[in-house]
Amino acid sequence: MLRLFSYWRSSAAYRVRIALNLKELEHEIVPVSLAPGVSEHRGDAYRAKNPQMLVPYLEDGNLGIAQSIAILEYLEENYDDLPLLPANEPQRSRVRAFCQMIACDIHPLNNLRVLNFIRTEFDADPADRWYAHWVREGFSAAE
């Protein structure tokens, strides 16, 4: 059975949960708390599975996969009964480009761990402006 290590507030993990449900794949959610003061993802057991110590992380038998886009591609290629991608080009490439825009251009710049670092190292006001700029730029292109 597929096992997804996930945190309920993680948008990256949410992407994978959506795909698993759209594809109607039987899976187990393994909660991994990223909450301050708990930080299960930094524990030795999780670090041994996933040295990056992030969610999502998918296990399929002995195979472990990190990073939401890699997981989505794996699910699409290996569980193709209910495809997520359109059947033809250029639609497939457009969907992939949209996914990459979110996962690579918007999400990393606005990730909570990145924003917390910026707010700690710099003032909150510039960090908030930085966040607003990248969200606006990314979603304007997506629209």
Task: Label each region the model flagged.
Residues M1-P126:
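GST-like domain detector, emphasizing the conserved glutathione-binding G-site
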